Amino acid sequence: MIREERLLKVLRAPHVSEKASTAMEKSNAIVLKVAKDATKAEIKAAVQKLFEVEVEGVNTLLVKGKTKRHGQRIGRRSDWKKAYVTLKEGQNMDFIGGAE
């Protein structure tokens, strides 16, 4: 069993993009920014506990940070982890339902 304190640190924010909204419509998957050291089991447990939905599967990927310039200085954004969480049939989760 994963401690509740860890579950709260696993999920960072929903990732809103055109690809994410297409994934939600076609395969009932939500896209989340998660902690870089989070495992698939931790992500699944956190989503099920915090949002009270049934999770079918979790796919993760590391997103490389972009190189950015500010004048002559060159910097790099941090790498981050993205998770595609597929919900079971009949389950629904709406992050932006109130924005109309």
Curated annotation (Swiss-Prot):
Signal peptide: none annotated. Part of the 50S ribosomal subunit. Contacts protein L29, and trigger factor when it is bound to the ribosome. Pfam families: Ribosomal_L23. Belongs to the universal ribosomal protein uL23 family. The keyword Cytoplasm does not apply. Coiled coil: none annotated. It comes from Photorhabdus laumondii subsp. laumondii (strain DSM 15139 / CIP 105565 / TT01) (Photorhabdus luminescens subsp. laumondii). GO terms for biological process: translation. Gene3D superfamilies: 3.30.70.330. It comes from the Bacteria. This is Large ribosomal subunit protein uL23. One of the early assembly proteins it binds 23S rRNA. One of the proteins that surrounds the polypeptide exit tunnel on the outside of the ribosome. Forms the main docking site for trigger factor binding to the ribosome. Keywords: Ribonucleoprotein, Ribosomal protein, RNA-binding, rRNA-binding. GO terms for cellular component: ribonucleoprotein complex; ribosome. One of its GO terms (molecular function) is rRNA binding. PANTHER family: 60S RIBOSOMAL PROTEIN L23A.
